């Protein structure tokens, strides 16, 4: 009998915290498959912990060991090995709320039994801030109908802080394979591609107003730490260019809500890239900013380019006296309010 869901857990030197993540996933029982992808860990006991869980729970846990390929290759490896109807990535320093997980899986079981399983299941996620012990939830009650099947026609407007992220989605595994997505190796921030590229293949969705995913944030070495993002801005640019290239948004003109959301997502990616290039502040970074907008212009249609220029992404590319100071200041205020990194 097919598993209801495959959880992929990319692990790289994660021994200090991965057990907590795995234990929350085990609460799903035999409905779930847990794929622990050891991404060439060498500094701690991560490989042994993966093998330990696979031996202890042979009908649930798979241990996959690969040469280091980065987070994206861990996700790719999970998709290659997944046998579940649905696929969800859970980073090894994050976890799922077990009560919410049981409710989500029960609902999915019911929908599958009725023959109405959605292509995409969406839930809330919670930022867990280690530095001050606070948390805040990103929910979508103003965007999606609750507790029923819907399509793109019924999707509302997203606020800038409301993007769908890897934390909030469960895709049907078939959709991920159908779209042909292969995440780039040795690149951070590929979770944006994971959410974005399959969207045109999604015909049905379901939203549950449950705080399922717990996103641990605040480690000094974390990829979303501001100083780390400035150092890795070239990887952010690589992901943004991949997203520019992976879908033809003009082909979606008859799906206005889907196209509008994908333009919104692309504009956010352009804005993030701009801001971290401004934070870098070097002449080289300024040139990369110019090149990124030129890349967008050359690799999309005039209508897509114009739409992004007139959005939040365009605001971060304005030029006026002290514009860089104003834009970075706006980012600092937003960061303080929304606490997104």
Regions found by a protein language model. Name each.
Residues 278-341:
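Membrane-interface aromatic/basic loop that binds lipid-linked glycans or pyrophosphate carriers
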Residues 23-32:
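Short, acidic, metal-binding catalytic loop of nucleotide-sugar glycosyltransferases
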Residues 71, 94-205, 213, 217-229:
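Donor-binding/catalytic cores of nucleotide-activated saccharide
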Residues 31-41, 62-67, 91-92:
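Short beta-strand/loop segment that forms part of the nucleotide-sugar
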Residues 24, 38-48:
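A conserved acidic beta->alpha catalytic loop
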Residues 66-82:
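Glycine-rich, basic loop-to-helix element that forms the pyrophosphate-binding segment
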Residues 1-24:
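N-proximal low-complexity "stem/linker" segments adjacent to membrane-targeting elements
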Residues 87:
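Short aromatic/hydrophobic "clamp" motif used to bind/position activated sugar donors
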């Amino acid at each position: 009998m097919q598993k209801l869901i495959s959880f992929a857990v990319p692990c790289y030197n994660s021994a200090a915290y991965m057990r907590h993540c795995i234990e929350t996933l085990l609460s799903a029982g035999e409905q779930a498959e847990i794929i622990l992808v050891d991404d060439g860990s060498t500094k701690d006991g991560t490989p042994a912990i993966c093998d330990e869980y696979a031996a202890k729970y042979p009908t649930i846990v798979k241990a996959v060991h690969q040469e280091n390929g980065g987070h994206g290759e861990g996700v790719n490896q999970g998709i290659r090995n997944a046998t579940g109807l649905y696929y969800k990535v859970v980073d090894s320093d994050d976890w799922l709320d077990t009560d919410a997980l049981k409710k989500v899986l029960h609902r999915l079981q019911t929908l599958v039994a009725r023959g109405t399983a959605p292509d995409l299941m969406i839930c809330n996620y919670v930022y867990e801030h280690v530095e001050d012990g606070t948390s805040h939830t990103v929910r979508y009650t103003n965007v999606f109908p609750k507790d029923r099947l819907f399509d793109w026609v019924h999707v509302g407007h997203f606020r800038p802080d409301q993007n769908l992220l890897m934390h909030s989605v469960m895709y049907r595994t078939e959709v991920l394979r159908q779209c042909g997505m292969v995440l780039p190796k040795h690149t951070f921030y590929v979770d944006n591609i994971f959410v974005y590229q399959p969207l045109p293949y999604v015909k049905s969705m379901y939203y549950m107003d449950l705080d399922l995913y717990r996103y641990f944030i605040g480690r000094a070495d974390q990829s979303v730490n501001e100083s780390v993002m400035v150092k890795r801005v070239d990887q952010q640019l690589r992901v943004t260019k991949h997203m520019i290239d992976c879908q033809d948004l003009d082909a979606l003109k008859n799906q206005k809500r889907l196209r509008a959301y994908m333009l919104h997502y692309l504009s956010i990616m352009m804005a993030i890239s701009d801001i971290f290039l401004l934070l870098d502040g070097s002449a080289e970074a300024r040139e990369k900013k110019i090149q990124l907008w030129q890349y967008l212009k050359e690799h999309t249609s005039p209508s897509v380019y114009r739409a992004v220029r007139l959005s939040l992404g365009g605001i971060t590319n304005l030029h006026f006296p002290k514009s860089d100071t104003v834009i970075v200041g706006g980012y600092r205020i937003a960061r303080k309010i929304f606490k997104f990194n």
